[in-house]
Design a protein with these regions (language model features):
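Conserved segment of the helicase C-terminal RecA-like domain
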Residues: 4-56
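Short alpha-helical segments that sit at the start of domains
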Residues: 52-67
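Short beta-strand-centered aromatic/proline hotspots
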Residues: 187-194
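Short, basic/aromatic beta-hairpin or loop at an interaction surface
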Residues: 147-166
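Short capping segments at the starts of secondary-structure elements
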Residues: 76-81
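Short, solvent-exposed secondary-structure boundary/capping segments
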Residues: 195-212
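Extended, highly charged accessory segments
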Residues: 86-152, 212, 220-559
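Short coil-to-beta transition motif at edge beta-strands of beta-rich domains
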Residues: 167-183
Length: 559
């Protein structure tokens, strides 16, 4: 598995494919990308061993499935009273709290749609099979699956004819016009023309006005996983402040998590560097906020859905108060706000103070207002409208205004279902409300980091990640971040040093701790050899001076 599987159930499903026979054992290895990825994978693997799976999230009375099943009933019998439909569906778990008003809303759409899917007498509370049944049968058999059919457009560099990515139809419908600049894979491109299911683009140097492309449905990292990753970082902070060496901490964690000590040590590098700088580490009970140039970075370890909800809420409220647009990005462990000088860390912390005092209803209303403006909502709207039969499966969105389409569904059961789906699959409102309550009751603290304008090591990991998706970080600054990141990683490497003058001194030293001119502490010689092997292996090699070496030892010496 390349990169973290993001969820326990995904890991079990994928690794399980390796042992599909009686008596065989499923084995798997996760190859990670950075420290976030590694710590996340460690937590997920531990949870898999302990059988701590994510709960199954059953949709709450989905209206699109209800409409489809009502058609199925009308195919079997021509006339159904509302109470008959109600009595049948209330016995199914997803519809346990279904009301006759819900049924009436769905039937209103089916009755007013052209051509009709059902003829309805609201006075008699009766649904009747329409005389013209072609549309009804087409709708039923074209929507047997609730899995959304989504058209994707291949983005092609016209100069090389090479594919550089894909865009989903919702983004293409709104912005897929010649001359529009957008960001994909961290670089700005300009649309030259759209031909069929291909979008031809050319590279541009100026990203001004470029629109970040929307990402499809990513697998969300659960709240519990993100919290445990944060608790590991908090534990490392505590132990280092008590004088425990990073190597010892890594060895201890390797006993708890299914990873070797070297892998754990690499995953802790940024956290160790963070603590060594004297900066507070973000933990499961601590939000830290830092400022870097025109960005405010909020370290909030609440997982994908809660962080997305928090990011959208913060971005919306800040935009309304400052009367200017605010760019916001998030990952499961942090939120990036591009304030362009309109707000600083103190203003963001003050915003949290205001949010925690707001009633839950106000939070929900503001988050809803923010959400319906996003590409995420428009994408869900297309999926739901298709499942209701309001949009043909392969409609050409180049001839349709997506904004007008969304507006036309306002107040309908389609709009309501799309909003419900966003709040179920993309945002975690209840978790957000709980987080704000925990901040209010001081169960979670929010602290400002004084960094002197330098980005912290843990934030650096997130910046590298978010730069792959958007132009949030300009390329010239990103180069400096990458150089700084590479420098920090190299300096945190541990190597074994050996005196090649007398072969009586070996020691493992972190490169960051080396003096400008390293010498042997025993004889003062500058003739030091450097190995990536463990100290015990090198010591055994040094003890054999003048003796015949094994093949492996000869290789070490040559290296």
């Amino acid at each position: 598995q390349y990169m973290s599987p993001r969820q326990v159930t995904r890991l079990i499903q994928r690794v399980g494919r390796s042992g599909h026979r009686i008596g065989r054992i499923a084995n798997g290895v996760i190859i990670t990308m950075d420290s976030d990825d590694t710590l996340e994978a460690m937590v997920i693997a531990r949870m898999a061993y302990k059988e701590q799976l994510e709960p199954v999230d059953i949709p709450h009375k989905p209206y699109d499935a209800l409409a489809h099943q009502i058609i199925g009933l009308l195919m079997k019998k021509k006339r159904w009273y509302f109470y008959e439909i109600y009595d049948m569906f209330k016995n199914a778990y997803p519809y346990a709290d279904l009301t006759t008003e819900d049924i009436q809303k769905v039937l209103t759409y089916m009755h007013t749609r052209f051509p009709r899917l059902a003829w309805v007498s609201f006075e008699d509370q009766l649904a009747i099979k329409p005389r013209q049944t072609k549309a009804m049968y087409e709708y039923y058999f074209e929507n047997l699956s609730m899995i959304p059919d989504e058209k994707q457009y291949l983005v092609v560099d016209e100069s090389s004819d090479a594919a550089i990515g894909v865009l989903d139809e919702a983004f293409t419908a709104e912005y897929g016009k010649p001359g529009v600049k957008f960001i994909i894979r961290g670089s700005p491109w300009k649309i030259s023309n759209v031909y069929g299911d291909k979008i031809y683009v050319k590279s541009v140097d100026d990203p001004t006005g470029a629109i970040p492309s929307w990402i499809g449905e990513e697998i969300p990292v659960p709240f519990e996983v993100a919290q445990e990753v944060a608790s590991i970082r908090g534990l490392v902070e505590q132990k280092i402040r008590r004088g425990v060496k990073p190597e010892e901490i890594a060895a201890q964690l390797a006993k708890k998590y299914p990873a070797d000590a070297e892998t754990v040590s690499r995953a802790l590098r940024e956290t160790v560097e963070h603590v060594q700088r004297g900066v507070l580490v973000p933990t499961d009970k601590r939000i830290v906020v830092e400022e870097w140039e025109e960005f405010v970075i909020i370290h909030a370890n609440f997982g994908s859905l809660a962080n997305r909800a928090l990011a959208q809420l913060l971005g919306y409220v800040l935009s309304e108060r400052r009367s200017t647009s605010v760019a916001v990005q998030h990952d499961p462990y942090r939120i990036f706000i591009q304030t362009m000088g309109t707000a600083n860390v103190d203003a963001i912390i003050g915003l949290f103070d205001d949010l925690k005092k707001m009633p839950n209803e106000t939070i929900q209303d503001q988050l809803t207002t923010a959400t319906v403006k996003t590409g995420l909502f428009k994408r869900r709207m297309i999926h739901v409208a298709r499942r209701f039969g309001a949009i043909k499966k392969w409609v050409d969105f180049s001839t349709v205004s997506l904004r007008s389409l969304v507006k036309s569904f306002e107040g309908s059961v389609i709009y309501e279902e799309a909003l419900k789906e966003v709040f179920t699959k993309d945002l975690d409102l209840q978790r957000l409300l709980q987080i704000l309550d925990d901040i209010k009751t001081n169960k979670i603290e929010i602290l400002k980091l004084e960094t002197g304008g330098n980005v912290t090591p843990v934030a650096r990991v997130g910046i590298e990640r978010v730069s792959m998706k958007t132009d949030l970080i300009p390329s010239e600054r990103m180069k400096l971040i990458l150089v700084e990141s590479a420098k920090a990683r190299l300096l945190n490497e541990v190597r074994t040093f050996v005196c090649t003058q007398n072969w009586d001194y070996t020691e493992m030293i972190r490169l960051n701790d080396l003096p400008d001119k390293p010498t042997c502490p025993k004889c003062g010689s500058t003739a030091l050899g450097v190995f990536s092997r463990e100290e015990e292996q090198i010591r055994s090699l040094a003890d054999k001076k003048g003796e015949k070496l094994t093949k492996n030892e000869q290789k070490w010496l040559e290296q």
